[in-house]
Amino acid sequence: MRPEYRNKKIEAYIRELIAQAIQKIKEPEFEYLKDYIVISRVLISKDRRFADVFVSVIGNSEQRKKAVELLEKYKGYFRTFVAKNVRLYTAPELRFKEDKGIEESVRINKLLDEIMSKEDENGSDN
């Protein structure tokens, strides 16, 4: 199996495992997060020592920041959960990051809508 393909499979499996681990946490501070957090993607380093976990959170910027901080606080739990379920020499160190891809796509769509509406206004004037 080619290493790139194996890494993609590992990334997908880690993404799934972290989502499962979040649902299993019984801490009160996680209760509100469970419905508003999405693990959008995982990128593992070539040597498989690090995994960047990109998180999308529905809410304002303060809630997103708090969610990433909370996930960072519990990253030892998540790493242990991954280690028990993935057959690797060592479990990768997890680094949680806010995924701004969804936010950026919404911003770009708004800009495109503005451009289209301006073009419609200019076209109807002539």
Curated annotation (Swiss-Prot):
Gene3D superfamilies: 3.30.300.20. GO terms for cellular component: cytosol. It holds the Pfam family RBFA. InterPro entries: KH_dom-like_a/b (IPR015946), RbfA (IPR000238), RbfA_dom_sf (IPR023799), Ribosome-bd_factorA_CS (IPR020053). Its main location: cytoplasm. GO terms for biological process: maturation of SSU-rRNA. One of its GO terms (molecular function) is ribosomal small subunit binding. PROSITE patterns: RBFA (PS01319). Keywords: Cytoplasm, Ribosome biogenesis. It comes from the Bacteria. It is found in: Cytoplasm. The keyword Lyase does not apply. Monomer. Binds 30S ribosomal subunits, but not 50S ribosomal subunits or 70S ribosomes. HAMAP family: RbfA. One of several proteins that assist in the late maturation steps of the functional core of the 30S ribosomal subunit. Associates with free 30S ribosomal subunits (but not with 30S subunits that are part of 70S ribosomes or polysomes). Required for efficient processing of 16S rRNA. May interact with the 5'-terminal helix region of 16S rRNA. Belongs to the RbfA family. This is Ribosome-binding factor A. The lineage of its organism: Bacteria, Thermotogati, Thermotogota, Thermotogae, Thermotogales.
